[in-house]
UniProtKB/Swiss-Prot annotation:
Entry's Gene Ontology cellular component terms: cytosol
Protein name per Swiss-Prot or TrEMBL: Mlc titration factor A
Family matches, as NCBIfam families: PRK15410.1
Biological function: Involved in the modulation of the activity of the glucose-phosphotransferase system (glucose-PTS). Interacts with the transcriptional repressor Mlc, preventing its interaction with DNA and leading to the modulation of expression of genes regulated by Mlc, including ptsG, which encodes the PTS system glucose-specific EIICB component. Shows zinc-dependent metallopeptidase activity.
EC number: 3.4.11.-
Gene of this entry: mtfA
Domain of life of the native organism: Bacteria
Keywords, sorted A to Z: Aminopeptidase, Cytoplasm, Hydrolase, Metal-binding, Metalloprotease, Protease, Zinc
Organism per entry: Salmonella typhimurium (strain LT2 / SGSC1412 / ATCC 700720)
Keyword Zinc: yes
Metal-binding is among the record's keywords: yes
Location in the cell: Cytoplasm
Length: 265
């Protein structure tokens, strides 16, 4: 169990969130003006409904809080804020943190060990993050701690535990499961060939279906060019679930950039 510190900094309500500055990160640059406006509206509600709690000397400010809220709401931009029900606090450490972890082996023996975690989430309870990895989530690299933990929360809306199959129509479950496992096997094949550190997709995706869904959700929003062409069938399922197409956003943004360059000549 994690013992929460008695002294923690909580972000207070702020009428003047710096949304323009908060949006100025690579992860969000391809959103249309309309999408940005709707994302801000969701983020404002998020900050009204959730407490951001800074731990172990970490200090929150309005810009940090606004960016955290925007990234939390990106996956539910088309789903609605109610998809983030089930937790009321976001606990933020300054760096990856140590927790006591218990696990049961194949013969039923329970083991305990201390492990370093970047983030944690449960069906009911807070989401725990760390600022170092949150900062690394601003870019478009395929890594995004916040989206990873949000994906677990969305996954757990479909049952007591994360399974890799979010709340989708029953008729789509078998196809989703088939395509997700095919992606896991493909990622594992690459790991076997080149090693974990050289794999083009985070090797954590091959560990189990829940982690595959969470990791690929990171790529879905922050590196669609690595996800969409490699797993096109699964990509379409993610587009249907999230009701977004980041790959299309990327293409439109690139085309507008090319047009702008031509206009300058």
């Amino acid at each position: 169990m994690i013992k929460w510190p008695w002294k923690a900094q909580e972000i207070t309500q702020n009428e003047d969130w710096p949304w323009d500055d908060a949006l100025a990160i690579p992860l969000l640059v391809n959103l249309t003006a309309q999408e940005q406006a709707r994302l801000i509206a969701l983020a404002e509600r998020f900050l009204q409904q959730k407490r951001l709690v800074a731990l172990q000397g970490f200090e929150l400010d309005s810009l940090k809080s606004a960016r955290i809220a925007l990234i939390f709401c990106l996956p539910i931009l088309e789903l609605g804020i109610e998809w983030l029900d089930g937790f009321h606090e976001v606990l933020i450490y300054p760096a990856p943190f140590v927790v006591d972890d218990e696990w049961e082996d194949d013969i039923g023996l329970v083991h305990s060990q201390r492990v370093v975690q970047s983030g944690q989430s449960w069906q009911q309870g807070p989401i725990i993050l760390n600022w170092l990895d949150i900062q690394d989530s601003f870019d478009a690299s395929g890594f995004n701690l916040i989206i990873h933990e949000v994906a677990h929360k969305l996954d757990m809306r479909n049952g007591d535990r994360a399974s890799g199959i979010p709340f989708i129509p029953l008729r789509d479950v078998a196809g989703w499961e088939h395509d997700l496992h095919a992606a896991m096997n493909n990622i594992q094949d690459e790991i076997d060939l080149v090693g974990e550190s050289a794999a083009s997709i985070d090797a954590y995706a091959a560990t189990d279906p829940a982690e595959c869904f969470a990791v690929l959700s990171e790529y879905f929003f922050s590196a669609p060019e690595l996800f969409a062409p490699r797993f096109p069938a699964l990509w379409q399922r993610f587009c249907q679930f999230y009701r977004q197409d980041p790959s299309q956003r990327l293409r439109v943004s690139a085309a507008e950039g090319d047009y702008g360059e031509e206009s300058e000549h």
